[in-house]
Amino acid sequence: MAELHRKSPVRLDIIVVGAGLSGLATAIATSLSGHHVTVFESAKELHEIGAGLQVTPNATRILKQWELPDRLWASAAEPTSVVVHRYSGRVLAREDNFDKNIRKKYQSPFLDLHRVDLHSALYEKAKELGVEFHLGESVNTIDFEKSEVTCLSGLKGHADLIVAADGLWSRCRACYLNRIDPPLPTGDLAYRVVLELDDITDPELRHWVENPTCHFWIGPYAHAAGYSVRAGKMYNIVLLVPDDLPDGVSKQSGSIMEMKALFEGWDPILTRFLNLVSGVKKWKLMHRDELDSWVNDKANLVFVGDSCHPMLPYLAQGANSAIEDGAVLGHLLGHMKSKDQLPKALRMYETLRKARGEAIVKETFKQRESFHMPDGPEQEARDKIFQSQLEGGKVEGPFPSRWTCPQVQPWLYGYDAYKEVEDAVLESPFPPAETNGGKNGATTSSI
């Protein structure tokens, strides 16, 4: 096994901009590598929003190694099967013993968590490691010449490395590009629903919640996903439909009547769940163009998470990939023997992470295409592939659900961030020292 939590003999000062999942993951991993970490977060209090989160083996193996609080694992739901339904309810494909199969193949579980539970566990771990937090501080400008951030309040922070973990609407990205760079709509939006078991009286629906499984319903231009969280005490549903939010509006309260109308005629189980909804929000799904580089020329700014590779939720890899980013970056920085090796470490990070992150983004768009086919010849051909698995029991070759596709699942779930770093360092060891050369980028950026 790769050596974990390798500590560098040199201690970098690192500023992480953003205390979402990617920021906290990076703060933990870099702190475990022996560096001094300060997080700047615009929110005055860390109240993570969101609902369910599917944490796949490529991330759970990292989280286990970070020794997060036991209560996180106690709050998880581990699905025993994955079922794909035609929107009418007819089963197209299923994998039973999913939990056992996943653990056997990847030596780490597939868990469904509440986003708040994961976020609070990461925050607690970061504080335990001595990470400093400046809450209510919005980074406004970055002086790359001085390696310094300035917040709207006037507070300044100097660091050897600034990590852009400020999400989809990244201010760091605008500073790096020296221009406003808003995210782009994908044409889809999400309705997010969480139901409490205590509010469900229907015996069949209660059974679904109490016995964790993962269900997908796929239909023309839309699909739904449902799974248990909080150890079977809550049920998370996400509905993906064409975007009808106005330009410039990223989220707003939704109409329950409108939401239910979009799924009229779908599986009665799904519509019975939707009849229990008392309030819902609509979230515009956004993406970004690829950056030319995730590291600036001065090697004092690096991107992680949604700031560089936001992902549609169709493979549930946004959070998982962000955790990978943090783990790889932190472990690489643990290999440094001197500060002048920082540029090499960051180049290696980009080599290990950029192509994979951008490839996952492309796979999410392919999954949307496979799940959202309108009725017709292509949909019928897709369903025949699904049915062949249901009848034969074994998936071979390309498969419309990448969650169980033998070509995609091992690539996604089999990824070992720490081993990737160890293999890369073995192939290209860190030299005794390296001069920080290269072209200078912009000195100060204030959009």
Label each region the model flagged.
Residues A51-K125, F371:
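Active-site-adjacent segment of FAD-dependent monooxygenases/related oxidoreductases
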Residues D13, H36, M234:
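Residues at the starts of beta-strands that form the adenosine-phosphate
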Residues V16-H36, F40-A43, V163-A164, G226, ...:
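Conserved mid-domain beta->alpha element of the FAD-binding
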Residues H35, L68, V131:
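Short phosphate-binding/catalytic loops that engage adenosine nucleotides
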Residues A2-R11, A74, S81, G89-V91, ...:
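C-terminal helical "tail/cap" subdomain of flavin- and related membrane-associated enzymes
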Residues A2-I15, L46-N58:
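Accessory recognition modules or surfaces
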Residues S88-V91, S120-S278:
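Conserved FAD-binding catalytic core of PHBH/FMO-like flavoproteins
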